[in-house]
Amino acid sequence: MVQYLKKIKLRPLERDDLTFIHQLDNNASVMRYWFEEPYEAFVELTDLYDKHIHDQSERRFIIEYSSYKVGLVELVEINYIHRRAEFQIIIDPNYQGKGYAVSATKLAINYAFSILNLYKLYLVVDESNEKAIHIYLKLGFIIEGRLIHEFFSNGKYRDVIRMCVFQNNFNNKY
């Protein structure tokens, strides 16, 4: 797999990684942008792992930098007929602002388009998450639209922006 930042790599999520994922899941500032309830019990996480380990409509990767776990990338809702999937990423707050999100996103997009032969990746991002939107635009994502009051988080409904990138556009850029 192509590496865009030295020593950054994606590898499949393993059972041994669940403690790291559990720490991210229990960080309210991280989960706010995933529009999910924080404070998931570890047993719930292991049950989800067991349920989805052989699910061909999902791929989950640990982002590593020099053998340190710095985040998680997910390709979910993979549809092999329409050749599309939803992209999701979490960077551990201790590693944010160091370029890992850009590099990991490039690696994940490359995997989706070169290995899975998908045509389109899409995502939804909180409209207030300007850093993420900037990264996605930089990598060739385009804005498809705005979803009004799409998620309830921290006591209020949040608007999100739906963005996508197409295989040919990404391949032409990189």
From Swiss-Prot:
Entry EC no(s): 2.3.1.57
Active site per database record: Y136 (proton donor)
Cited PROSITE patterns: GNAT
Domain of life: Bacteria
Chain positions recorded as Mg(2+) binding sites: E36, E77
Reaction(s) the record says it catalyses: an alkane-alpha,omega-diamine + acetyl-CoA = an N-acetylalkane-alpha,omega-diamine + CoA + H(+); spermidine + acetyl-CoA = N(1)-acetylspermidine + CoA + H(+); spermidine + acetyl-CoA = N(8)-acetylspermidine + CoA + H(+); spermine + acetyl-CoA = N(1)-acetylspermine + CoA + H(+)
Binding site for acetyl-CoA: 89-91, 96-102, 129-138
SUPFAM superfamilies (UniProt xref): Acyl-CoA N-acyltransferases (Nat) (SSF55729)
Listed GO CC annotations: cytoplasm
This protein's record includes keyword Metal-binding: yes
Keywords: Acyltransferase, Cytoplasm, Magnesium, Metal-binding, Plasmid, Transferase
Localization terms from the record: Cytoplasm
Site feature: Could be important for selectivity toward long polyamines: E86
Residues noted as binding spermine in the record, renumbered to the chain: M31, E36, E44, H52, I53, H54, D55, E86, F87, Q88
Residues annotated as domain N-acetyltransferase: 8-159
Single GO molecular function: magnesium ion binding
Binding annotation for spermidine: E36, E44
Predominant place of localization: cytoplasm
Gene3D superfamilies according to UniProt: 3.40.630.30
Pathway(s) this gene product operates in, as recorded in its UniProt entry: Amine and polyamine degradation; spermidine degradation; Amine and polyamine degradation; spermine degradation
Keyword check for Transmembrane helix: no
Its job: Involved in the protection against polyamine toxicity by regulating their concentration. Catalyzes the transfer of an acetyl group from acetyl coenzyme A (AcCoA) to the primary amino groups of spermidine to yield N(1)- and N(8)-acetylspermidine. It can also use spermine.
Family recorded in the similarity comment: Belongs to the acetyltransferase family.
Assembly with partners or alone: Homododecamer.
Database matches in NCBIfam families: PRK15130.1
Protein name: Spermidine N(1)-acetyltransferase
Record organism: Wigglesworthia glossinidia brevipalpis
Gene designation per UniProt: speG
